Amino acid sequence: MAKKPTQNFETTLQELESIVNHLEAGDLPLEQALTEFETAIKLVQQGQQRLQQAEQRIQILLNKDEQAELADYE
């Protein structure tokens, strides 16, 4: 099975919200609800990973900024 390319955070969040709405409606057959739930769990994991990556990038940028030498601006 081909692996689905990683979505951006916003798309992942939109898809997750859609699944939650379907599950909350309560009109899905059990097997479909379980499949949707499984997909939602994977999306949550992807979202968490994207947030962790963003947090790491921010930390790197802040650390670089703290180590930079101050210079007069002309």
Curated annotation (Swiss-Prot):
* Functional description taken from the UniProt entry: Bidirectionally degrades single-stranded DNA into large acid-insoluble oligonucleotides, which are then degraded further into small acid-soluble oligonucleotides.
Please list the GO terms describing molecular function.
exodeoxyribonuclease VII activity
Keywords for this protein: Cytoplasm, Exonuclease, Hydrolase, Nuclease
Here the disulfide bonds are none
Q: What protein family is recorded? A: Belongs to the XseB family.
* Oligomer and partners: Heterooligomer composed of large and small subunits.
Gene encoding this polypeptide? Answer: xseB
- Quote the Pfam families the UniProt record gives: Exonuc_VII_S
What reaction does this catalyse? Exonucleolytic cleavage in either 5'- to 3'- or 3'- to 5'-direction to yield nucleoside 5'-phosphates
This protein's source sits in the domain of life called Bacteria
What protein am I looking at?
Exodeoxyribonuclease 7 small subunit
Q: Which GO terms describe its biological process?
A: DNA catabolic process
InterPro entries per the UniProt record, alphabetical: Exonuc_VII_S (IPR003761), Exonuc_VII_ssu_sf (IPR037004)
What EC number(s) is this enzyme filed under?
A: 3.1.11.6
What GO CC annotations are associated with the protein?
A: cytosol; exodeoxyribonuclease VII complex
Q: Cellular location of this protein?
A: Cytoplasm
The species this protein belongs to is Haemophilus ducreyi (strain 35000HP / ATCC 700724)
